[in-house]
């Protein structure tokens, strides 16, 4: 990028669209393997600093978080010996091979596989002809560890890079609240919150997702950690219908801990209004069904939904349900999903832990 007087401004990846340039550097430097090695080395140092890399009970973390690590358009998650790399821009897709070489150089023998997973994240997919696949190795080992709990990672068909690593800290917090409670995990996907609740001492855990594949994966992950444990049951049902039916049948369970972690209701600003209606409706149903003294963990992962937007939707839901509610915790993404101070939009995950009278 140059000024009208041909003075240097920045170097970045160009593509046609709403974001035409993703800036990689404001220094006049070459974007080559050495450039990526330096950025990746700094990113790794950050993860060592915050204590998520090289832990015996945790081999899962985000190494690169796009703009937060000064590598816009690139996400890299580490699952034990496998790095899952995802491009969100054409330029980063074109650089995928030198990024992979840089990653091998920086990580040395701590990774043996690099899986490239960008089919669903790239624009102009037809023109690029992109297919997911290994850039290094080819291991089919799919079990990773987070805070001592094991789970399967579906590199090929799973959402994002295969697991929602951004909820690690929030899952740990949920574990502390689970002892003796009857837990409902809505939009469970891989069941992460469910098996943390089980380890925390929950007396019953129900996992709900509209996708049968998600239910199968949840059951597999629960079995991996708690084989033959009768406390868990999973249901392939619509979330709103499931909430409506709570307490409708004699002897059916009620819940005193509910997790609401839906997929993004809005991916662009035009969808914001309907998204906020969705969050209000969802939370209202949870407020209406939870038992007195219950706890709700509620989240939004929509970047266009601000903290104030989300809080207002939740507060409106509480008022409509006629429940008295206290905020116990305000939640966000973990430290391995850093936010560049010049890119506040990187703060996408927001959540609340609520006590409901």
PLM regions and their residue ranges:
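Conserved class I S-adenosyl-L-methionine
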Residues: 180-189
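Conserved SAM-binding loop of SAM-dependent methyltransferases across substrates and taxa
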Residues: 190-203
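Conserved SAM-binding motif I beta-strand of class I
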Residues: 204-209
């Amino acid at each position: 990028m140059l000024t009208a007087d041909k003075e240097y401004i920045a170097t970045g990846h160009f593509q046609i669209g709403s974001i035409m340039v993703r800036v990689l550097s404001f220094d006049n430097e070459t974007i080559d393997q050495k450039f990526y090695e330096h950025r990746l080395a700094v990113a790794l140092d950050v993860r060592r600093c915050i204590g998520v890399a090289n832990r015996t009970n945790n081999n899962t973390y985000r190494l690169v978080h796009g703009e937060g690590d000064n590598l816009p358009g690139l996400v890299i998650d580490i699952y034990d010996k496998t790095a899952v790399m995802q491009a969100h821009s054409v330029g980063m897709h074109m650089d995928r091979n030198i990024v992979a070489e840089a990653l091998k150089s920086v990580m040395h023998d701590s990774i043996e596989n690099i899986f490239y997973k960008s089919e669903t994240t790239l624009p102009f997919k037809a023109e690029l002809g992109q297919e997911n696949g290994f850039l290094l190795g080819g291991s089919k080992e799919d079990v990773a560890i987070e805070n001592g709990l094991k789970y399967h990672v579906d590199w090929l068909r799973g959402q994002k890079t295969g697991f929602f690593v951004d909820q690690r800290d929030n899952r740990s917090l949920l574990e502390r609240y689970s002892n003796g409670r009857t837990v409902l995990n809505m939009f469970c996907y891989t069941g992460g919150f469910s098996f943390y609740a089980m380890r925390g001492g929950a007396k019953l855990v129900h996992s709900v997702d509209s996708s049968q594949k998600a239910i199968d994966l949840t059951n597999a992950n629960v079995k991996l950690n708690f084989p033959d444990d009768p406390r868990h049951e999973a249901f392939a049902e619509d979330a709103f219908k499931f909430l409506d039916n709570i307490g409708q049948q004699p002897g059916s369970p009620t819940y005193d801990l509910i997790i609401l972690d839906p997929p993004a209701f809005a991916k662009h600003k035009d969808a914001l209004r309907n998204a906020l209606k969705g969050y209000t409706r969802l939370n209202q149903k949870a407020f209406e069904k939870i038992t007195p003294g219950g706890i709700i963990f509620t989240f939004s992962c929509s970047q266009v939904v601000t903290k104030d937007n989300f809080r207002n939707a939740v507060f409106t839901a509480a008022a409509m349900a006629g429940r008295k509610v206290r905020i116990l915790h305000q939640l966000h993404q973990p430290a391995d999903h850093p936010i560049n101070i010049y890119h506040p939009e990187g703060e996408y995950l927001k959540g609340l832990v609520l006590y409901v009278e």
